[in-house]
């Protein structure tokens, strides 16, 4: 019985690890970014007031785009003339569980 329990325990551990390594992606306006990257974007935008003041109330994303902490999958957004609007939309989408289809109760997923 103990011989069978070890492979089952290992398989269960691998399944848990595999689930934790899968990322949730957000697709918007031709961009595909990780949910974790959008959460990092939120963190960058919630830095002290002096940073937000330099951001020009988020209308000019050049300060954000020059930040080395900006995740690499968000950097292509910086090349778009609508970068500020795209960043705003990504942040909005990331806060809606049904938009992400991660909530089983949501319809249309």
From Swiss-Prot:
Residues 1-23 form the signal peptide. The keyword Secreted applies. Endogenous activator of intestinal guanylate cyclase. It stimulates this enzyme through the same receptor binding region as the heat-stable enterotoxins. May be a potent physiological regulator of intestinal fluid and electrolyte transport. May be an autocrine/paracrine regulator of intestinal salt and water transport. Belongs to the guanylin family. One of its GO terms (cellular component) is extracellular region. Disulfide bonds join 65-78, 98-106, 101-109. Residues 24-94 form a propeptide. GO terms for molecular function: guanylate cyclase activator activity. It holds the Pfam family Guanylin. Small and large intestine and atria and ventricles of heart. Both uroguanylin and prouroguanylin are found in plasma. It is found in: Secreted. Keywords: Disulfide bond, Secreted, Signal. It comes from Didelphis virginiana (North American opossum). The gene is GUCA2B. This is Guanylate cyclase activator 2B.
